[in-house]
């Protein structure tokens, strides 16, 4: 639309069309034009013959304006100049770029839109309007509607006047900004015009307050009254000129607007304010936009001057400045609230002005050992600040980078851009006990008790806030990148710097008190408040001075704190009262610097810049080191983010010295908190997602109408299955088309690029048409890779089609690329790649056709990229694998009854009479029905496992057609223990079933699969946790009429499943069944040694991933790399055969590549090189080399990823610090057979998927097959919600593992990954509607563990009770002693709260009594933490905080630091008054009781919270083992 407009803009004008030749008639009343622009350039238009033809569609489209006017004319139109309504319009310049209306003063402006009759008419065709793709030029614009109080915007061309009604969606933001300016003008007019009841003699504060009230209603454009004030002031010049234009038509008794003092004052104030501009622009005409301070130095510019045209550059600069302001205001924001005088700006406190209120300079000194706060917390991805953990800080002090004490007042209370104040702090950190500081406390600077906590130094403080309540109580908190700290008492030395802040808070609260008692807050102006404060008694805590001037000075210099208190006050009338307007105005008048408030997401600086870091005995381990990479990984990521070489030493140095601040989400590299109500991963939920289930339908090809010579080249090679002759080559218009090559075809959609198809075979049809059958070659940018794809790489798909050779547009330069793979070929392939890149660049420079290549098959329905089936493609045999896949899918979707009517096929499964089957639980009613509950991590009521039945017979229906409605199936139901009672389920084996006489007839579509049911004595020897086999046992009979269980009667002889593998049976001992004690200690058969892969575990943690893979019999973790000492020690304790490197992986990779003689291929920092050189010879000797490592797995830390959405071409240095680059470089250098990446689920979606895409692109460039998916650990046998993203990579000749089947019911939806073109992929189905086994509950998991008290630290204990549940028996194994059943100590207040939380499901802080309690030290505290009720509405009621677990529910996501006020606040034992123990958390993750953890209790919780649940790792390992066996099978042998 805009492009067409740009073309139309260049047409020349000819005499006006006939529509102008009308008789003179009386003119209708036109709106008064204010500040209308009239002096413009001329531009001609030309009426072409084509305009006489109108194509009728849903809305008529014409190219010429006069035709649109003629088609929309009404019989009632009598005016000599037409007026029309204008909808769906865009205003743009001659280049087709959308422009604000005021740019008419600089450029020619044209219009595109739907022209409608001037009034609503009954003619439906005319009321639809006529779209004119480009018309104008716009001659001038005007605003009317002043008397009505609602602005009407008019634009005029030479032919007509247009009432602008509704802009196009793409133009709405631009137009809405201008409309709000018009609204402001009308609002000011109504307040000043006597004819409208206004008063031209009011003051500026009163005028602004009135305008705020007027504009607050009916507009979502402004987030607060303060934002409206800022906007009105900024547009003072515009408003003045609009009202000045009304003087010509003003009534005699009306005042001249140009002489109204308040309007002149508004204009002057507008010319003085700072209008921030973030950057200088140099437009094509050479105009340079100055910073605001520079503009302010020159004389104020008015619209009058602009109209005169005396200074085009200035005029253009001011209009561009206004456009910048619009863009700044329209930045998207979440949960915006009025946080200062404006949501756009924060006025900086001037240190010189407040210096007299503070003591003389002093410096921070301490003899205490302090720990870097970044060691205590982890953070990953972007997160809103309210989701950070909350702590208390006692005995604290704040200082700058020189350790000089500094006031908190100098730091903005909102997160802002370009802050030039660096404030750090130190103190004693404890858990947040919810305590407040009383304003009546006479000694706020002394510590009444010695806090029991850790001495820490903080990273840079980013913002702070004040909270206050009744009874003169106040709380002040500060935020760093990793936590919120509620401030307790400061240190004695810092107390003098603290008192002014508290005093200002008291003053603000006192002013609020003044206003609350007034019947109308508008009665108190700034002067009134100043007078009242000066009249306070000297003993009043808000007393400043008896001198009003001193009070005014204090209010203004400390005004930003007071404005913040008003901004968060819940009463809108108070927020925009005259006092606030007056104070904000006085702050503006002092010309304070403004900071722009930015989006509130947290950013982590890996290097703590606190000056204490260099002196602290506990050095920070969080120092960021640029990732060590191979050149291949460095190139892929570097080219994406930067155009310069990251290996340039000058730029590398600059990057190392620069700040490394990126946004991230709270948590750590592994930890992720699940939120309720999440239904997927995609951020854009407007379009309906389409899940990939089968290959796409072929694209619609545009047939060719041209005539070209087409003939076969060569003889026929054979025939298709239909007897049609096959050919190898054909000449199409002189171009050779060959089987195995590629051709381009035009598609119906003109916006799409030509489709490229791989030629499978060519044939001549029976009607003598020359045909081609091809498979679609997908461009990389249209796959999940997006912009990370190589523009020359195509991917074969399973989408195929047949078309005529005459439809071919051209022949593509294309090759199937196959290169030798393995670490020994890396250098050879690098050389070949360089030559290929050079050739491609040369062709691009010469504008030659692109040479495409294909290495992989892309299968979105399988979620991955696979090796090309080279033996099956391009054979010219008339056979197509894609067609076969489609035929198989069609067969799977149909039902087929066998001839004997004893079996049938459905969904690809063959069922026969006497088979044991799964039945959808919704198809068979349960004994007890329940409903799901809504509290966090609640009960599993309503979640039911599949019903196990035996197929007895097939019941035909009257219909003879074999479809879903032609027959039913009769089945016998087996009951599960949970069908009887919760107690029975708890004490029974999860694989146990009960025989019954109940039968039911069901449709075959109710069946979900097959399973086996055996006698208990026939169960396999290698039973293991977690379950991966569909095998059950049955020894008991359930009488549903009596609800009783008994041994199977002799007359009941169920026909159990036939056992095909006798090696899985237990060895019988006489006639009796093996005892339970003996069965528990039988060890599973050890898997063959040759199948275990030599594994390198990177970012190994305590070893959860390695443990599960090892248990699956597929991995031998010979090497592990872990940065944290306690975690590395835990890994070593549980994997004594492994060589564990407790070091930075960047250093280890550098050392390995040096050992292999490949340091030239290594991109690393000087620091990494030096540390690698310091490794001992013994350490170096144990380093693995390429060829020794078969499998690499790990979960790289994620901090900093989310910051990439802010990266530009100069931000490559920030990306280099990401550990995923090093992780991928290990894969590139070693080229193992298999590679597994694990991460939090948002890894695939944050940063618009760029990191995920680059990871896939890197692995594909190495030559790997790749697949991706998200799994829920709760569906694999743990009682915990933990969603994790995985990426498998396999060497080209290997088999990619499938995703493990979820075995347990768990209440989560499908976990989808966004692909492209609105498609989504889910690795596995959701088990919310059924699975083979029931969910594991909290009681199943920890019900047998002995009671412990709050703070119990005894590491070794006895079990005291026997294991009851199936899970408990499996998790205990042969362990005799219970270890790590220890819990964190809560402080006295939280312990009291815990004891008051009821021991019932769903109980949390909402159940606390609303009263106070006196602690042992005499302090009086509220039972309900103060911050929860005040902020509950914004945080889903803080559901789960101080929450108890439910015996029948599941655990929330395991975190590294369980606490009642943490991100996962549900951490109280279901019955005992304490936080969960280390062992209980370990069990929730599926760690066996024999697993050991290292370090103190915080280290152990951290190790567990960061770990991959071993049962999930086991399930992945089983599928890897299957893939290894599958490779050895005959069908996969070359």
Swiss-Prot record:
Keywords: Chromatin regulator, DNA-binding, Isopeptide bond, Methyltransferase, Nucleus, Repeat, S-adenosyl-L-methionine, Transferase, Ubl conjugation. Residues 735-869, 909-1049 form the BAH domain. SMART domains: BAH. It catalyses: a 2'-deoxycytidine in DNA + S-adenosyl-L-methionine = a 5-methyl-2'-deoxycytidine in DNA + S-adenosyl-L-homocysteine + H(+). Gene3D superfamilies: 2.30.30.490, DNA Methylase, subunit A, domain 2 (3.90.120.10), Vaccinia Virus protein VP39 (3.40.50.150). Residues 706-716 have a biased composition (Basic and acidic residues). Residues 1-33, 321-341, 647-717 are annotated as: Disordered. Residues 657-678 have a biased composition (Acidic residues). GO terms for biological process: DNA methylation-dependent constitutive heterochromatin formation; DNA-mediated transformation; methylation; negative regulation of flower development; zygote asymmetric cytokinesis in embryo sac. This is DNA (cytosine-5)-methyltransferase 1. It comes from Arabidopsis thaliana (Mouse-ear cress).
């Amino acid at each position: 639309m805009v492009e067409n407009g740009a073309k139309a803009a260049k047409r020349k004008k000819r005499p006006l069309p006939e529509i102008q030749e009308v008789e003179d008639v009386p003119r209708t009343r036109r709106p008064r034009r204010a500040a209308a622009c009239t002096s413009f350039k001329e531009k001609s238009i030309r009426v072409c013959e084509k305009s006489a033809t109108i194509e009728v569609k849903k809305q008529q489209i014409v190219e010429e304006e006069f035709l649109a006017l003629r088609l929309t004319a009404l019989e009632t139109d009598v005016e000599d100049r037409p007026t029309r309504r204008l909808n769906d319009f865009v205003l743009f310049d001659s280049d087709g770029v959308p422009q604000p209306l005021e740019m008419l003063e600089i450029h020619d402006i044209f219009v595109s839109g739907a022209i409608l009759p001037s009034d609503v008419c009954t003619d439906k065709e005319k009321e639809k309007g006529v779209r004119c793709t480009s018309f104008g030029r716009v001659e001038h614009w005007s605003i009317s509607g002043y008397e009505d109080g609602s602005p009407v915007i008019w634009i005029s061309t030479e032919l007509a006047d247009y009432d602008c009604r509704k802009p196009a969606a793409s133009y709405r933001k631009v137009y809405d900004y201008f409309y709000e300016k018009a609204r402001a003008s009308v609002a000011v007019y109504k307040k000043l015009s006597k004819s409208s009841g206004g008063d031209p003699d009011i003051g500026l504060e009163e005028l602004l307050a009135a305008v705020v009230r007027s504009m607050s209603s009916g507009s979502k454009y402004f987030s607060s009254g303060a934002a409206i004030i800022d906007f009105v002031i900024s547009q003072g010049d515009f408003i003045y000129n609009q009202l000045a234009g009304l003087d010509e038509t003003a009534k005699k008794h009306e005042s001249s607007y140009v002489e109204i003092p308040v309007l002149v004052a508004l204009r002057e104030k507008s010319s003085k304010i700072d209008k921030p501009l973030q950057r200088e622009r140099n437009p094509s005409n050479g105009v340079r936009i100055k910073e605001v301070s520079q503009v302010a130095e020159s004389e104020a510019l008015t619209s009058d001057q602009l109209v005169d045209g005396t200074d085009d550059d200035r005029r253009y600069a001011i209009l561009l400045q206004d456009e910048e302001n619009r863009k700044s205001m329209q930045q998207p924001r979440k949960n915006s609230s009025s946080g200062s005088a404006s949501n756009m700006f924060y006025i900086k406190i001037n240190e010189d002005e407040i210096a007299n209120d503070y003591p003389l300079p002093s410096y921070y000194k301490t003899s205490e050992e302090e720990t870097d706060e970044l060691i205590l917390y982890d953070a990953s991805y972007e997160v809103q600040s309210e989701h950070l953990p909350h702590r208390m800080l006692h005995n604290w002090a704040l200082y700058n980078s020189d350790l000089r004490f500094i006031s908190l007042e100098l730091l903005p209370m909102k997160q802002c851009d370009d802050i030039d104040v660096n404030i750090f702090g130190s103190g004693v950190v404890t858990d947040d006990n919810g305590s407040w500081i009383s304003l009546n406390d006479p000694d706020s600077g002394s510590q009444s008790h010695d806090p029991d906590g850790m001495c820490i130094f903080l990273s840079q403080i980013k913002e702070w806030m004040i909270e206050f309540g009744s009874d003169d109580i106040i709380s002040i908190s500060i935020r760093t990148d990793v936590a919120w700290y509620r401030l307790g008492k400061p240190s004695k030395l810092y107390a003098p710097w603290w008192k002014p802040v508290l005093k200002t808070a008291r003053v603000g609260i006192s002013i609020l008190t003044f206003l609350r008692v007034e019947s109308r807050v508008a009665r108190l102006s700034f002067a009134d408040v100043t007078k009242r404060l000066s009249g306070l008694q000297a003993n009043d805590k808000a007393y400043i001075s008896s001198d009003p001037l001193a009070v005014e000075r204090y209010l203004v210099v400390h005004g930003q704190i007071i404005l913040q208190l008003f901004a968060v006050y819940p009463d809108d009338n108070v927020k925009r009262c005259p006092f606030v307007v007056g104070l904000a105005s006085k702050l503006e008048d002092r010309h304070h610097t403004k900071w722009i408030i930015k989006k509130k997401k947290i950013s982590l600086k890996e290097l703590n810049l606190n000056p204490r870091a260099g002196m602290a005995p506990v050095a920070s381990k969080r120092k960021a080191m640029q990732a060590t990479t191979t050149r291949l990984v460095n190139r892929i990521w570097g080219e994406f983010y930067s155009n310069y070489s990251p290996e340039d030493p000058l730029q590398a140095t600059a990057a190392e010295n620069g700040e490394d601040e990126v946004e991230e989400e709270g948590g750590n590299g592994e930890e992720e908190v699940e939120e309720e109500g999440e239904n997927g991963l995609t951020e854009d939920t407007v379009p309906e997602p389409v899940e990939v289930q089968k290959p796409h339908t072929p694209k619609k090809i545009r047939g060719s109408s041209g005539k070209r010579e087409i003939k076969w080249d060569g003889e026929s090679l054979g025939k298709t299955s239909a007897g049609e002759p096959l050919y190898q080559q054909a000449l199409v218009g002189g171009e050779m088309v060959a089987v195995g090559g590629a051709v381009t075809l035009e598609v119906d959609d003109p916006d799409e690029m030509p489709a490229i198809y791989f030629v499978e075979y060519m044939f001549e049809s029976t009607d003598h048409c020359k045909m081609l059958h091809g498979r679609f070659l997908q461009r990389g940018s249209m796959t999940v890779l997006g912009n990370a794809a190589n523009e020359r790489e195509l991917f074969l798909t399973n989408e195929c089609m047949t078309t005529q050779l005459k439809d071919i547009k051209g022949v593509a330069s294309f090759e199937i690329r196959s290169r030798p793979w393995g670490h020994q070929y890396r250098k050879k392939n690098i050389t070949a790649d360089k030559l290929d890149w050079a050739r491609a660049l040369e062709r691009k420079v010469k504008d030659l056709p692109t040479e495409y290549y294909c290495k992989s098959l892309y299968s979105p329905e399988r979620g991955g990229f696979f090796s090309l089936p080279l033996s099956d493609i391009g054979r010219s045999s008339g056979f197509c694998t894609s067609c076969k896949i489609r035929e198989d899918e069609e067969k799977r979707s149909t039902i087929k009854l066998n001839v004997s009517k004893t079996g049938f096929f459905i969904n690809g499964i063959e069922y026969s009479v006497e088979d044991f089957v799964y039945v959808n639980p919704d198809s068979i009613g349960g004994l007890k029905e329940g409903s799901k509950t809504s509290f966090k991590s609640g009960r599993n009521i309503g979640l039911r496992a599949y019903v196990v039945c035996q197929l007895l017979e097939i019941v035909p229906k009257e219909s003879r057609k074999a479809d879903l409605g032609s027959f039913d199936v009769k089945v016998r139901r087996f009951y599960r223990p949970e069908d009887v009672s919760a107690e029975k389920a708890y004490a029974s084996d999860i694989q146990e079933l009960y025989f019954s006489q109940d039968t039911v007839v069901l449709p075959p579509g109710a069946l979900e699969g097959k399973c086996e049911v055996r006698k208990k004595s026939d169960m396999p020897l290698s039973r293991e946790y977690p379950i991966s086999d569909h095998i059950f046992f049955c020894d008991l009979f359930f009488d549903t009429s009596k609800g009783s269980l008994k041994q199977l009667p002799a007359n009941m002889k169920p026909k159990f499943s036939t056992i095909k593998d006798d090696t899985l049976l237990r060895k019988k001992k006489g006639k009796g069944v093996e005892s339970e004690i003996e069965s528990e200690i039988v060890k599973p058969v050890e898997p063959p040694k040759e199948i275990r892969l030599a594994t390198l575990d990177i970012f190994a943690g305590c070893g959860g991933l390695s443990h599960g893979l090892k248990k699956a019999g597929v991995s031998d973790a010979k090497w592990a790399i872990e940065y944290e000492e306690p975690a590395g020690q835990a890994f070593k304790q549980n994997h004594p055969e492994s060589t564990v490197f407790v070091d930075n992986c960047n250093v280890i990779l550098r050392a390995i590549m040096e050992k292999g003689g490949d340091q030239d291929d290594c991109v690393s920092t000087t620091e990494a090189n030096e540390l690698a050189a310091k490794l001992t010879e013994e350490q170096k000797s144990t380093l693995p080399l390429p060829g020794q490592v078969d499998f690499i797995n790990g979960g790289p830390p994620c901090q900093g990823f989310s910051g990439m959405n802010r990266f530009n071409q100069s931000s490559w240095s920030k990306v280099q610090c990401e550990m995923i680059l090093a992780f991928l470089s290990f894969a590139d250098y070693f080229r193992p057979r298999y590679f597994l990446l694990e991460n939090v689920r948002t890894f695939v979606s944050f940063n618009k998927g760029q990191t995920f895409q680059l990871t896939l692109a890197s692995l594909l460039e190495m030559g790997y097959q790749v697949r991706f998916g998200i799994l829920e650990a709760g569906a694999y046998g743990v009682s915990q919600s933990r969603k994790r993203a995985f990426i498998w990579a396999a060497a080209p000749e290997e088999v990619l593992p499938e995703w493990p089947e979820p075995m347990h019911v768990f209440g989560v939806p499908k976990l989808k990954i966004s692909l492209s073109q609105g498609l989504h992929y889910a690795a596995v189905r959701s088990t919310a509607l059924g699975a083979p086994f029931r969910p594991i509950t909290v009681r199943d998991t920890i019900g047998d563990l002995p009671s412990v008290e709050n703070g119990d630290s005894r590491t070794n204990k006895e079990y005291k009770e026997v294991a009851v549940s199936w899970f408990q028996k499996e998790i205990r194994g042969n362990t005799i002693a219970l270890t790590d059943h220890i819990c964190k100590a809560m402080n006295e207040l939280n312990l009291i709260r815990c004891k008051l939380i009821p021991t019932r499901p769903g109980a949390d802080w909402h159940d606390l009594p609303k009263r106070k309690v006196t602690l042992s030290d005499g302090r009086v505290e509220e039972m309900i933490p103060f911050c929860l009720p005040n902020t509950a509405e914004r945080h889903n009621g803080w559901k789960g905080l101080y929450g108890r677990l439910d015996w029948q529910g599941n655990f929330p996501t395991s975190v590294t630091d369980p606490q009642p006020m943490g991100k996962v606040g549900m951490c109280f034992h279901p019955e005992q008054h304490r936080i969960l123990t280390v062992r209980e958390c370990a069990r929730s993750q599926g760690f066996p009781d024999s697993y050991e953890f290292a370090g103190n209790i915080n280290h152990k919780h951290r190790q567990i919270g960061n770990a991959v649940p071993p049962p999930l790792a086991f399930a992945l390992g089983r599928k890897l083992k299957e893939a290894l066996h599958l490779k050895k099978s005959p069908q996969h042998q070359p």
